[in-house]
């Protein structure tokens, strides 16, 4: 089998310390804020010349938490309730031969920093903190937007959105600039498809806080917010 080597050019800095709760697709929670920090050998600002003229980017990255688990020819997509198997190449499962992810994200700004050189501030990313990034490309509407596209099983899959009950006293414990994103993440039902007990208390690690919640029917209720 042929093999190739590939370099990590950057890492994502995000509010997700673990993979639990990360949106299942990029762009679902636009209020999420993250930063792309380049590795030292790729901090030449010339490599980013002109990138500020694009509103969105494609990033190619590694499902680093799935590498140890290998790949499977069939997987159970969460949007099908975790009960139906589909071919891995017909899904976006992390359990792939090369563990590569592809995300479309919004470019919010380009900043020159003293410590890390030029960094990219982005919105709507679905990556864990520290995720390795292999490449960045501009999103080009005339070539990347297919108005006649069909979405396979995702076109008919159910809506996983939940109503979030976040008591004001608990919400106020989060930094103001993280509140909308936290609610957005919770509304997309972070629970695994195989864990849906209304009695279970779940914990979401987000932005340095442990957000504990329960779910009954279609309502997610936050029970506790703890600073880590």
Where are these regions (language model features)?
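Mixed-charge, low-complexity intrinsically disordered regions
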Residues: 1-100, 112-228
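Conserved positions in beta-strands of structured domains
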Residues: 13, 105-108
């Amino acid at each position: 089998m042929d093999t190739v080597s590939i370099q990590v050019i950057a890492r994502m800095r995000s509010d997700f310390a673990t993979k639990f709760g990360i949106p299942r697709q990029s762009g679902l929670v636009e209020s999420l804020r993250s930063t792309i920090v380049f590795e030292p050998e790729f901090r030449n600002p010339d490599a980013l010349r002109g990138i500020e003229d694009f509103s969105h980017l494609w990033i190619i990255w590694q499902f680093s938490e799935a590498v140890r688990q290998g790949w499977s020819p069939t997987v159970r997509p969460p949007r099908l309730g975790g009960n139906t198997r589909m071919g891995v190449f017909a899904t976006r499962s992390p359990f792939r031969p090369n563990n590569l992810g592809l995300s479309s994200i919004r470019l919010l700004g380009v900043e020159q920093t003293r410590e890390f050189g030029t960094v990219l501030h982005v919105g709507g990313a679905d990556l864990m903190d520290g995720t390795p990034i292999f490449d960045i490309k501009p999103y080009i509407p005339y070539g990347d937007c297919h108005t006649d596209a069909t979405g396979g099983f995702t076109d008919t899959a159910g809506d996983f959105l939940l109503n979030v009950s976040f008591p004001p006293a608990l919400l106020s414990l989060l930094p103001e600039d993280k509140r909308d994103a936290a609610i957005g993440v919770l509304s997309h039902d972070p629970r695994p498809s195989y864990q849906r007990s209304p009695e279970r208390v779940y914990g979401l690690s987000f932005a340095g806080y442990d957000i504990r919640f329960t779910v009954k029917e279609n309502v997610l209720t936050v029970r506790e917010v703890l600073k880590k």
